[in-house]
Amino acid sequence: MSVGGFFSSGFTRQPKGLVGYVLTAYAALFVLWSAYAAVFSRLDALVLVTLFLSFMLVLVFSTIAAVSERPEDDPEGIPVYDWFFVLFSICCGVYFALNADAIATRITLLDPLSVTDITFASLLIILCLEVCRRTVGLLLTGIVICFMVYNLYGHVLPAPFGHGYIGFEHFLDIMIFTTDGLFGTPLRVAATYVLLFVLFGTFLANAGGGEFFNNLAASVAGARVGGPAKIAVVSSGLYGTISGSPTSDVVTTGSITIPMMKKIGYPATVAGAVEVAASTGGSILPPVIGSAAFKIGRAHV
């Protein structure tokens, strides 16, 4: 596998017919519910993030395939194994939402986990790892797995690399049944603040915001030496103020600026690097300032 293969994600499928209509309605209802819940709902925080994660898992398994390239004989629709992933995602969300009070009141590492707790916790971790692989690639997923293995087997390593014994139940207790693991600050921020700003940025971009920023950048830097590269930097910075996402920034502005840079002689790798660097910097500009700022702010409250 090439280096790029470690970063490759699954191809995006677009189911048609009844399944496509159902998924579209599901996604719309999910966005509306999430926006309402983030602002007005008095749901317990654990219930909110549990349902949010479950809904997101269902969307990923429904729309992103397990492989990076679409096979020639690939039928349109969702494979049977992905329907099982969808079912497992729903079951995990329902289980943890129904048991939110028991989870919130239990004493960590003292109250034992039941067999059902261990089963659903293990299943949820597997589902999240698979979603990570499909959306980001093998590299980040491999790093996460390495740290998980280190947690479980680090006690066999010599000093200074080893640590005290951590059993599997202990590991699940911290990762799933406390706010220091999967249901911690990053997911809570994503389910509240980040979702609203990404929703705002999406509406603005589809209303012509991305084209406006590109035109504004072209008027400022288009006539200068290295104009297309400067247009990429300025437009990505401006678009980053409303998206907060380097990925959406690259997709929106890069689809215009990268071909412009290649047309005047920039190597493809340089053109891509300029756009990626500009989009990454643009994602931390106010007012959205990326999700990291919200995570930092919430951690210090």
What is the role of each PLM region?
Residues 1-111, 118-122:
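Conserved, well-structured core domains of diverse proteins
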Residues 23-27, 115-123, 227-231, 267, ...:
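Short hydrophobic alpha-helical membrane-embedded segments
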Residues 62-73, 128-133, 205-211:
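C-terminal ends of transmembrane helices
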Residues 73-77, 104-199:
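Hydrophobic transmembrane alpha-helices of multi-pass solute/ion transporters
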Residues 119, 187, 200-204, 238-245, ...:
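Hydrophobic alpha-helical transmembrane segments of multi-pass membrane proteins
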Residues 214-282, 288, 292:
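Hydrophobic transmembrane alpha-helices that form the pore/transport pathway of multi-pass ion
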Residues 299-301:
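Conserved small/polar residues in nucleotide/adenosyl-binding loops
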